[in-house]
Amino acid sequence: MTQSLINTKVLPFKATAFKNGEFVDVSEKDIAGKWAIFMFYPADFTFVCPTELGDLADHYTKLQELGVEVYSVSTDTHFTHKAWHSSSDTINKIEFAMIGDPTGQITRNFGVMIEEDGLALRGTFVVNPEGEIKIAEVHDLGIGRSASELLRKVQAAQYVANHDGEVCPAAWQPGEETLTPSLDLVGKI
């Protein structure tokens, strides 16, 4: 079994991303002091990937309202991201950074590299303002992810971070009751 990345710091990285029609440099310094999502996917110009990224683009405004920056990452180059962004109506609506990781450094740092293929698994990681990974989810290549569930998880992670001693139960939504673990609760849930 591999070691969990939960509560570990994001390792240093430098990359070039395509964002808002420009190539921009991105590093771990860009996430300091804010919440961030890293969404790894296998490749541009494929099948499940645009459905996931389009879904995430539809939720980007809500995530930004929560102070969350989004980074999609594949082992394609930033040039390939630009070409895909220019040719696909679904991908064209993306406003978040599309990181090119052709060396696989970032993909390996997050433990989602498929070495024999040079591609990333479908990995999603939520990072807190201290640079610690708080949520890690990895899917098989054939299983797409839900941005609405990711939004809910981010809201839960932020709630727990701001409410010491409280935890969010399954399917928790903002405004619903949380739990405060104690001896009194044992066996009563």
For each predicted feature, which ranges?
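Chalcogenol-based redox active-site neighborhoods
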Residues: 1-189
